Amino acid sequence: MAIHKALVMCLGLPLFLFPGAWAQGHVPPGCSQGLNPLYYNLCDRSGAWGIVLEAVAGAGIVTTFVLTIILVASLPFVQDTKKRSLLGTQVFFLLGTLGLFCLVFACVVKPDFSTCASRRFLFGVLFAICFSCLAAHVFALNFLARKNHGPRGWVIFTVALLLTLVEVIINTEWLIITLVRGSGEGGPQGNSSAGWAVASPCAIANMDFVMALIYVMLLLLGAFLGAWPALCGRYKRWRKHGVFVLLTTATSVAIWVVWIVMYTYGNKQHNSPTWDDPTLAIALAANAWAFVLFYVIPEVSQVTKSSPEQSYQGDMYPTRGVGYETILKEQKGQSMFVENKAFSMDEPVAAKRPVSPYSGYNGQLLTSVYQPTEMALMHKVPSEGAYDIILPRATANSQVMGSANSTLRAEDMYSAQSHQAATPPKDGKNSQVFRNPYVWD
């Protein structure tokens, strides 16, 4: 019997001296043998909450990164200067949302000094960034909804940054004072979920952690209450932005109420302190996705839309592009105006359109078309006809003398014929004498 007890003590002694050997011998399914036990929750298939939250947070990181690129790339296409002034604050909000998704991994892994310090400090700071940006946006929306003119972009961003710096100072002082006080007391102070050392950030009680977030809750409450007056402004086109903020803050209030109750009361009542870390991780992932779905995506979809004032000016003074289609449209409009002569003035056409001396030229040689001269026409006259009738004798006519044209007109020929008929012949015979019409008697 004594030999049996001694054998049991010899076999059990290495387990007490080397507790890591027992942990390495019980690797959860899905994890490799050489993995640090700190990261077992990331691959443990028996407790799937870590893998699910890891996938949700990874999808959120990718989505937030893509939305940030889209928002920054759309800056040259933003026509409304009032919306452009909010882009800096919205990019700052996206960075805070990206940090919330990354902080989920710190809550999934098992607690140690670094992970607990990041949880206690970054949890309040990252939420303060998001809620400060929402509060600054509400501050600008109240001006825009009433006056259609808000503060400048750097003013809005400065307001969000100053509100965030307040939480940074609060968290820094709280974390330092808590650690220094715990190390000075030296007592076995700790959390109900684990017996950590006094100076460790993981030794902070759940109630103390929630009390340190009072300023963040005030930011959330201010953004929620400030969104209501923006819905009653005179300029209705800013109401939808107020609805986005109101829906986001209302969802955040519901999430915060649930996780605070579970973190401070529910887990303790059900004797399950190991669910403290999953509670924080679920709250981070749920609230970050609420920011993306209810605020970021609607704002990105509205950022490139023009204001009603710019649309009205575009209708009054349309932009004229330089291109082939524009030239064709202008020529078509001019031709339609010229061809429509229903209400045009009665003016001579020659005065409007000067005739070119080459308008009758069709590209053919002149020798191909027979054009008789005046002498050729004179020689073709039959010889038995009276030359006086064909070529009448020129007389002293006032109209002919006053005319500067050398070409005979019809009335000149008629007057010459009548004069020849009235003059009797000199020799009494019907003689035919050729008289040159260009020589005066």
Curated annotation (Swiss-Prot):
Tissue localization of expression: Expression is highest in the periphery, particularly in the stomach, but also in the kidney, liver, pancreas, and prostate. In brain, levels of expression are generally lower than in the periphery, with the exception of cerebellum, spinal cord, and dorsal root ganglia (DRG).
This protein's UniProt keywords: Cell membrane, Cytoplasmic vesicle, G-protein coupled receptor, Glycoprotein, Membrane, Phosphoprotein, Receptor, Signal, Transducer, Transmembrane, Transmembrane helix
Glycosylation sites: 191
Induction and repression of expression: By all-trans retinoic acid (ATRA).
Stored Pfam families: 7tm_3 (PF00003)
Function of the molecule: This retinoic acid-inducible G-protein coupled receptor provide evidence for a possible interaction between retinoid and G-protein signaling pathways.
Protein's recorded name: G-protein coupled receptor family C group 5 member C
